[in-house]
């Protein structure tokens, strides 16, 4: 046998051995292979478009595939449950979700968590299965709204007194209930001169908020303030104030922002907005989910913050960044 043949056989054996080892050894897991869906309450909401933009950016930065999922409205609870079940069936590395309803999503999240890690953002659920929960302290957000409303009323009348109301977008949403409780508690303990004459729930539609506010104005001509506890209600209530030219008389604090509510703020139909950071929730939600999927330790609860925005401070760089996020 020639030396050339011996070398060729040895080379072949070496290559075959290397191929066997490569086949036998587990392949490393790369971030590019990881899928982490984000499931929001309402994909049509500007607020949630900001959150999805944050998640999308995290996916790009971290090399993670991020399917952007969600119901068509916050009232579509069953739709979100189905989306969650389908997402889990795809065996992702983790799931990021903002539950539409505190009680209704509890058991579905418990069930999903048996298969994949669940990260919660924005709103809670009746479940202890979240590996981490990133949200505004919504109770504190309600208190901030009460302080802002009292200040606006005092600025207009010289005193923290008068009839006020609160309109909540939909019953049963954890974040909204916490805002409501924080607002009512702050008014009760800090502003005895403010009397809550109406505590109403809508159906998640801005038109309903508009109609409710119009009815409140008609039935309660002495009303001086309203807390509209989310973006949809701020849109509807702000529209009612604008149409009736009552910005000087009835002060409204909304929650969250978009072009319409910022316009109302500039024009005086709204006195203030409590603004969260949904971009951070989306970005850090994906980042946290990836860490959990790798077995890393993460914080159980993360407060993503809230700020009172008024016409006086809306041009400040920090506030401007919250009002004008990059969503593309």
Segments and roles (model prediction):
Residues 1:
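SF2 helicase/translocase NTPase motor core
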Residues 4-6, 29-328:
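A residue-level marker of the well-folded mature domains of exported/periplasmic proteins
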Residues 7-13:
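N-terminal export leaders
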Residues 14-19:
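Sec-dependent N-terminal signal peptides
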Residues 20-29:
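C-terminal segment of classical bacterial N-terminal signal peptides
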């Amino acid at each position: 046998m020639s030396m050339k043949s011996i070398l060729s056989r040895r080379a072949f054996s070496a290559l075959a051995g290397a191929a066997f080892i490569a086949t036998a050894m587990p392949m490393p897991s790369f971030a590019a292979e990881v899928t982490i869906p984000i499931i929001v309450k309402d994909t049509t909401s500007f607020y949630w478009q900001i959150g999805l933009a944050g998640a999308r950016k995290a996916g790009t930065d971290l090399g993670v595939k991020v399917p952007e999922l969600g119901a068509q409205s916050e009232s579509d609870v069953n739709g979100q449950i189905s989306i969650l079940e389908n997402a889990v069936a795809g065996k992702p590395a983790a799931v990021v979700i903002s539950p539409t309803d505190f009680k209704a999503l509890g058991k579905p999240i418990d069930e999903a968590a048996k298969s994949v890690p669940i990260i919660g953002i924005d709103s809670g659920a009746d479940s202890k299965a979240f590996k981490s929960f990133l949200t505004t302290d919504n109770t504190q957000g309600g208190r901030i709204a009460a302080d802002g409303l009292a200040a606006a009323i005092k600025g207009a009348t010289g005193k923290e007194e008068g009839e006020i109301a609160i309109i909540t977008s939909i019953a049963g949403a954890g974040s909204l209930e916490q805002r409501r409780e924080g607002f009512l508690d702050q008014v009760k303990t800090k502003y005895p001169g403010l009397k809550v004459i109406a505590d109403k729930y809508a159906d998640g539609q801005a038109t309903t908020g508009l109609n409710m506010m119009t009815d409140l104005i008609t039935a309660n001509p002495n009303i001086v303030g309203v807390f509209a506890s989310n973006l949809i209600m701020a849109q509807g209530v702000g529209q009612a104030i604008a149409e009736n030219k009552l910005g000087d008389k009835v002060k409204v604090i909304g929650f969250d922002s978009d072009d319409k509510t910022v316009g109302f703020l500039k024009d005086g139909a709204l006195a203030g907005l409590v603004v969260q950071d949904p971009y951070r929730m989306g970005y850090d939600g994906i980042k946290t989910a990836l860490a959990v999927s790798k077995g890393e330790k993460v914080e159980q609860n993360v407060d993503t913050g809230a700020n009172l925005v008024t016409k006086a401070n809306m041009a400040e760089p920090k506030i401007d960044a919250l009002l004008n996020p990059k969503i593309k």
